[in-house]
Amino acid sequence: MNRRHFLSMLPMSALPSLSAAEFLSQKRTFIGREKFDAVVRLALAGNWRAQPMGQRVALFGQALRGTRYVAWTLEIDDRVESPSVNFNGLDCWTFFETALGLARMIATPQPSYSPSDLLRQIEWTRYRGGVCRGGYLDRIHYLDEWFTDNAARGNIKYITGKIGPVTRMTGRTNDEMSLEPKIYRYLRASPALIPALNQIERRLEKVPFHYIRKEQVAACEGRIQSGDIIGIVTHRQHVFCSHVGLALHTADGACRFMHASLTAKRVIVDKPLHEYLAGIQAHAGIVVARPV
């Protein structure tokens, strides 16, 4: 009996933390090897490892500029969950997460870097407690929980309250996924997961959530650093955050929003953050986290 056969016979709860290849082939979980290699070469040639963490995140974010926007890049199977990266197409979540994963990866000096090295970093930040056991609910699906979980494990500092005055979110639910399960590939295939997902959502709603109103962001931009993770808080019902990207201070002195843009259909460095927020009525404000 080989190791893969043995692992397949174990209950999910008995599985240790494994690389993505143990759940799905890297032919499915790692797309764009040539671009990965090119970005890593650029980072090594520029000695990006010597930069502070936030600056490294910003550099990798800029290296991903122009990558086309592709929605649902996290939904790669009907039933099996596995850490994944797609350098040929990014959505807002996978953009910031890939830049962060690359920045974390090169912090450890190695002669070379492989897809497995990045996938391990993705697993560490994408999944609750840093562990994927092959189940859909191992993954963190709401950005507010991503901030809480990763801050608790020392991957980021949640600094919204230090950046500017905050307002507490009230009168809102955080249940978008359980209300609309048919738009999620895994939930369509496994509707039995919905009650457990709803329990997670109910738990998240009990966690106090504070944000900076968009009208106050312009006065706060000087305290935001390049590479900070910017969660966009929405006025929409049933979810707190609807978008995410990275801050980037550019040569003109502006604090700009770098993100995978559905409108532009690619990764871009957008307007100054406060202008970007003002231009979209549904945006209510921001939350901020700093990679460490």
Regions found by a protein language model. Give the residues of each.
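Acidic/His-rich structured neighborhood in mature extracellular/periplasmic domains
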Residues: 70-202, 259
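Solvent-exposed, acidic/flexible segments
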Residues: 33, 50, 54, 58, ...
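Second-shell loop/turn segments in exported
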Residues: 42-50, 79-89, 234
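Mixed-charge, Lys/Arg-rich low-complexity intrinsically disordered regions
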Residues: 200-220
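C-terminal soluble interaction/assembly domains
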Residues: 230-288
